[in-house]
Amino acid sequence: MDALRAAVQNGADAVYLGLSAFNARRGAKNFTLEELQEAVTYCHVRGVQVHLAINILVSDREMLEASECIRRAAQLGVDAFIVQDLGLVALCKSIAPDVPIHASTQMSIHSLEGVLEAAQMGVSRVVLARELPREEIAFICRNSPVEIEIFVHGALCMCYSGQCYLSSVIGRRSGNRGQCAQPCRMPYGFGRFEESRYPLSLKDNCLVEYLQEIRAMGVASIKIEGRMKRPEYVAVVTRIYRAVLSGRPVTQADLADLETIFSRQGFTQGYYVGRTGEAMFGTHQDTPEDRDLMAGARASYERGENPRVGVTFYAMLRSGEGSQLAVEDDRGHGART
């Protein structure tokens, strides 16, 4: 919940999260159903949407459990399902037809034809593959019948999202089952080289300097990867992207804060600008924590607002009589005047 609060308090319009099963970050501290209810209430009172990630491949023997997950989440009021498995798309439409379906980046949709096919299946938003250059994103946005979302900040896979089998082959932990062991972040040696090189580790993506261009393309939503990051990271990155998206120019202080809170020897825009190569690679370096930056980030979500409570108002009006106004919250507390 701290990371969720950090996102909301720093300007997120929507948050995406997962339950303990059926999501691509099963190693994270995911939400229970009770915590999901708390998250939905917290976000909806503040005008923020909750998107539930069910973004792995699901086997036949798991479909009953997945169906129950979809049903309960819909009852709790989630605003969208983020889905990879085509079978789950049909299941979501059957069980919760009023909840929008977003095609996960794990679907590897990288062309207009893929977007059109997803739209035919009933998907209302497509999260494009991270590897697309700006020209192809713009072309898809101009011709897409559904909303387009792209990742603008966070970790990049060495392989195309949803198409990597390295973790499964090396450690029997499939990335398409939410269990990626991140072997691309490990050192590898070969020949006369010692095992001190990281030939598969990409720097994190950072497109903060391109936000106005991305908006002009018609991208409906920008996405920040942060589900296994500290709340302070979520706070800092969300705050900066919100400010720039609202029209403030990017500053050197912004770029410094983004790099300080987490980076892998800087950032890359290689896929977006179409300049792939050796400059995209880097590793995370342990550096002393910036105490002022971390303290400010924590304060933004720990002391960012007065508590809010969702309430319902009732008016009782009778001709020739006094009027009554009643208010009640979702826990049964109320007042009348």
What spans do the regions from the language model cover?
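Alpha-helix capping/helix-boundary segments
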Residues: A3, G87-L88
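Surface-exposed amphipathic alpha-helical tracts and adjacent flexible/coil segments at the periphery
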Residues: R5-Q9, A14-A21, V40, R46-I56, ...
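Glycine-rich, positively charged N-terminal anion/phosphate-binding segment
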Residues: R25-H44
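Short active-site loop/helix that positions an aromatic residue
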Residues: A90-K93
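Conserved phosphotransfer cores of two-component systems
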Residues: A96-D98
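Conserved nucleotide-cofactor-binding alpha/beta core module
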Residues: L112-E113
